[in-house]
C-alpha cells in the first residue's frame, strides 16, 4: 500500500508543471495577439473580452 502512495506522489510532482499547458490564460499583449485579439479599453458590439493585456484597464478583445 505504501508503494501506491509513493507512486501517486511521484505522478503528482511529475505532472504538476503540465497544469499551465491546458489553461489558456491571457494576461499579456503577446498572448492576446497570438489568439487573434487586440488590446482595447472597452470591448463593444460583437467583440468579446477574452482576458486582460497585463494592465488592469486594458482588455483583450476578439470578435465573436
UniProtKB/Swiss-Prot annotation:
One of its GO terms (cellular component) is extracellular region. It is found in: Secreted. Its main location: secreted. The keyword Glycoprotein does not apply. One of its GO terms (biological process) is defense response to bacterium. Belongs to the beta-defensin family. Keywords: Antibiotic, Antimicrobial, Defensin, Disulfide bond, Secreted, Signal. This is Beta-defensin 5. Disulfide bonds join 32-60, 39-53, 43-61. The gene is Defb5. Residues 1-23 form the signal peptide. Has antibacterial activity. Transmembrane segments: none annotated. It holds the Pfam family Defensin_beta. Coiled coil: none annotated. It comes from Mus musculus.
Amino acid at each position: 500500500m505504501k508503494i501506491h502512495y509513493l507512486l501517486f506522489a511521484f505522478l503528482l510532482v511529475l505532472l504538476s508543471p503540465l497544469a499551465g499547458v491546458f489553461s489558456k490564460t491571457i494576461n499579456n499583449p503577446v498572448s492576446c495577439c497570438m489568439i487573434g485579439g487586440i488590446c482595447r479599453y472597452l470591448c463593444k458590439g460583437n467583440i468579446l473580452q477574452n482576458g486582460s493585456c497585463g494592465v488592469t484597464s486594458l482588455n483583450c478583445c476578439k470578435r465573436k
